């Protein structure tokens, strides 16, 4: 999996059968380096990242996201939703969304368009997800069907909270 963080990337390669971690690395961008340029630099220098993988995931780690109920979600209205929450989209960003099965939740977020194109050249079947989508799914897997469960995900400068009750998400926020 590849995790795009604000100042670089984290990479984890694991065996799909044993789940054993084979490779892990973090790459921090230099001050004048774009994420796309950083991606090209790291894949040029590291042959492990150019292998064929059974599955590949790009995890977007961004504070700019929001949740919307599936009952009112329309994919054609992504730009309007974004305008309501953040006023503007960056010139090199594309709005994406994850529908979280059986929850009634859609996570809307943006990705760096140039970076996504570069990564897709190496991994044409890569699956892109926002970290909040993964955390909600992870929390639901851990939650029992009855009672309330609180999951807190800590980061260097922030945290995410996912609260579930009776197997359903109640709150998911940063």
Where in this protein do the model-derived segments appear?
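Short glycine-rich phosphate-binding loop at a beta-alpha junction
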Residues: 50-64
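Short, conserved beta-strand segments within well-ordered enzyme catalytic domains
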Residues: 1-3, 10-12, 57-59
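Surface-exposed loop/turn elements that mediate protein-protein interactions on large endomembrane-trafficking
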Residues: 18-22, 73-76, 124-127
